[in-house]
Amino acid sequence: MIEKTGNILDSSADALVNPVNCVGVSGAGLAKAIAQRYPRWAAAYKAAARRGDIRIGYVWRHAADVAFDAPLIYALPTKRHWREPSRLEDVAAGLEALAVDVCHSEFPPTSLALPAVGCGLGSLPWGQVRPLIEAAAEKMDRSGVTVYLYPPGAL
C-alpha cells in the first residue's frame, strides 16, 4: 500500500473506489465528484441502486465510461441512506467484499485508488477505519494489486 496525497480523481490507478450509499444518490463529496466526471457511471450506479444491486457488504463495479483510459470504478456502500452516518461494521464488510472481488477477479486491476471510506461525510474516525483499509490492502497487495491510499482530506 502506498499513501498518496492530492485529488484521487487524478490518480493513474486502473481502478478507484467510490464510497456510496445504497439509494443511488451522489449529492456530495467524492461520490458527487465522480458523478460529475463520469455521468454514464453515475446513471448506471443509480439504476443499480433502484434494482437493489447496491447493498452493504457487497461491491458493484462498472467501467467509468466507454473511453479507453477511463478507470474501473468500484462502488463500495458505506451508508445505507445518504442521510445516515456510516457504520464501522458496514465499512468493514465492504472492504472485505472489495478485497475478495479484486483478488478473485478474472481480470483484476493492477492498481487501485482507495479513499478513506466512511470517514468524510460518513463521520467515522480515521483511526478506526485505517486498520480495516490496511487489512484489505494487504490482501490485494499479496494478489499483485498496488493499492494507493488517499487519507482524509485528499478529496
Q: What function would you assign to each model-found segment?
A:
Residues 1-155:
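Macrodomain-like recognition of ADP-ribose-binding/processing modules
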